[in-house]
């Protein structure tokens, strides 16, 4: 009972943008690749990538672990940080743990974490 390519494509077509973004991120982590890298850089990237990451991390991800008791305030902060619509922000908060922002600077990640924690959320910066 193998899954066909058509079934996979049909499943992906029915995913929301947030679900699809999470799928891409999980695939990038599982296979150690980046969907945003140009082909020329991707060929040289795996050899240089881990060494650079060990030196100093420059890109951070803000992960919403839970909304806490004040979910409405957390949704408002998520909307302000991400420019998502109300439904998308609510889906993101309801689906925690979820990445709120990815690939951002250390300062921006700290600011986002501060805002979310002040709203009552449990947040992790990776």
Swiss-Prot record:
Keywords: Ribonucleoprotein, Ribosomal protein. One of its GO terms (biological process) is translation. One of its GO terms (cellular component) is cytosolic large ribosomal subunit. It comes from the Bacteria. InterPro entries: Ribosomal_bL12, Ribosomal_bL12_C, Ribosomal_bL12_C/ClpS-like, Ribosomal_bL12_oligo, Ribosomal_bL12_oligo_N_sf. GO terms for molecular function: mRNA binding; structural constituent of ribosome. SUPFAM superfamilies: ClpS-like, Ribosomal protein L7/12, oligomerisation (N-terminal) domain. Forms part of the ribosomal stalk which helps the ribosome interact with GTP-bound translation factors. Is thus essential for accurate translation. Homodimer. Part of the ribosomal stalk of the 50S ribosomal subunit. Forms a multimeric L10(L12)X complex, where L10 forms an elongated spine to which 2 to 4 L12 dimers bind in a sequential fashion. Binds GTP-bound translation factors. Belongs to the bacterial ribosomal protein bL12 family. This is Large ribosomal subunit protein bL12. It comes from Geobacter sp. (strain M21). The gene is rplL.
């Amino acid at each position: 009972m193998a899954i066909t390519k058509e079934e996979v494509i049909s499943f992906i077509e029915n995913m929301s943008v947030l679900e699809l973004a999470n799928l891409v991120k999980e695939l990038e982590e599982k296979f150690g690749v980046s969907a945003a890298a140009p082909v020329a850089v991707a060929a040289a990237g795996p050899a240089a990538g881990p060494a650079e990451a060990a030196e100093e991390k420059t890109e951070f991800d803000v992960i919403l672990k839970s909304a806490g008791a004040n979910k409405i305030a957390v949704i408002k902060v998520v909307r302000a940080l991400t420019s998502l619509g109300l439904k998308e922000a609510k889906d993101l908060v309801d689906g925690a743990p979820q990445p709120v922002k990815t690939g951002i600077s250390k300062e921006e990640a700290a600011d986002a974490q501060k805002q979310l924690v002040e709203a009552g959320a449990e947040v992790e910066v990776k």
